[in-house]
Amino acid sequence: MMKHVLNKCLMGESLSVQEAEQVMEQIMSGRATASQVASLITMMRVRGETAEEILGFAKGMRAYARKFPAVIEGTIDTCGTGGDGLGTFNISTASALVLASLGVPVAKHGNRSVSSKSGSADVLEELGINIQASVEEACQMLETTNLCFLFAPLYHQSMRHVAGPRKEIGFRTIFNLLGPLTNPAGARYQLLGVYDEAAALKMGEALRQLGSEHSLLVTGADGLDECAIHGDTHVVEVKDGRCETYRFSPDDVGLPLGNLADIQVDTPAESAALIRAIFSGDGPQAAKNIVALNAGAALYACGNASHIAEGVHYASKAIESKRVFRYLQSLQQQGRGIKHA
C-alpha cells in the first residue's frame, strides 16, 4: 500500500480520509519503512497537507493511543503545535494552572521540547509537577487536583516509528499538527495554538469531524501559537458542528498591548522562573496579561465564561489574588512535585 500512496503523492494527488487512516495504521504498526515515512511526509509538506489527510492521520493515531480511563465532564486541554520560533515562555502551561486553580479539569497533553526552547514537559518538571505519572496516577491527579499531565511518549508509544525520520529531516510535518488532535483523555474542549492560520483552518475542520464540543484554534501576531498580547489573534472557533473565523486584539478584551520581548525566554528554567514570578505577584505586566488572555479564552471554550473578555476577567482575578500561586504550592505540598516553587 505504501508504494501506491507514495506514487499518488508524487503525482501531486491528495489522500482521502480513509487512505490517510490506512497509511497511519501502516506507520503506527511499524510496517512502513523509515524511508517511506520520510518520503511521504516530505511530499505532503511540499504539496500542503489537506484537512482530510490530517483527519485520517489523527484517527489512525488515536486508534493506537493508550487509553485514558477517566472521563470528567468539561475536561479541557491547552495545547499548541509549537514551531513558531518566537522563544516565548510556556504560556499554555501557565494557563492550564490558572484553569485548574479555578476548578476546571485540565488534561494537559504535551512533550519535551522538539522545536521550541522549552516544551510543556520541560517547564512542568522545573515547576515540580510529575510529568511521568502512570495512567492510574494521572487519573487520580485529575480527579483530586483538576490537573494532570499526559506525557505524549507514554500514551503514543507507536510514534517511536516516526521519531527517526522526523529528526533526520528536521522540518515541520503533518506530525506537528497531530499532537493537539490526539489528547488521550479525549478532551472535547480545547484551546489550541497553531503557528499558521492556514493550518489552523485545516485542523479546525479535522476537530469538527472528530466531534469537538467547543474549541478555539488561535494564531497570534507573527505566527505565535498562542493568543497574542503584542498584536491581533486569528481564531478558528469550532462549535455546534461549525467552524467560524474572526480576529480580536488585546484591547477588544480589556487588555493593553504588550511587548514580545517581555514574554521571551531561553531555557525551561527561565520559563519556570517567569511563571513563578507571574503567580507570586512579580514579573512583567505583559507576561501576566498574556496568561490571563489565554486562560480567559480557555474558560470561554469550556463554557465557564460567556465570552473571552469575561474569561480574562476571571483569570486576572485568580492571578492577582495569588489563588494560582497557592494552587501551585498545594500541588507540591501534596507530594506530587519534585521541586519547590
Curated annotation (Swiss-Prot):
Pfam families: Glycos_trans_3N, Glycos_transf_3
Residue numbers binding anthranilate 1: 80, 111
GO molecular function: anthranilate phosphoribosyltransferase activity; magnesium ion binding
UniProt-annotated binding residues for anthranilate 2: 166
Keywords recorded for this protein, A-Z: Amino-acid biosynthesis, Aromatic amino acid biosynthesis, Glycosyltransferase, Magnesium, Metal-binding, Transferase, Tryptophan biosynthesis
Chain sites annotated for binding 5-phospho-alpha-D-ribose 1-diphosphate: 80, 83-84, 88, 90-93, 108-116, 120
Cofactor: Mg(2+)
This protein's record includes keyword Ribonucleoprotein: no
Pathway: Amino-acid biosynthesis; L-tryptophan biosynthesis; L-tryptophan from chorismate: step 2/5
GO terms for biological process, alphabetical: L-tryptophan biosynthetic process
One cellular component term from this protein's GO annotations in UniProt: cytosol
EC code(s) of this entry: 2.4.2.18
Cofactor: binding details: Binds 2 magnesium ions per monomer.
Binding site for Mg(2+) 2: 225-226
This protein's record includes keyword Metal-binding: yes
Subunit details: Homodimer.
PANTHER family noted in UniProt: ANTHRANILATE PHOSPHORIBOSYLTRANSFERASE (PTHR43285:SF2)
Name of this chain's protein: Anthranilate phosphoribosyltransferase
Organism: Shouchella clausii (strain KSM-K16) (Alkalihalobacillus clausii)
Name of the gene encoding the protein in the UniProt record: trpD
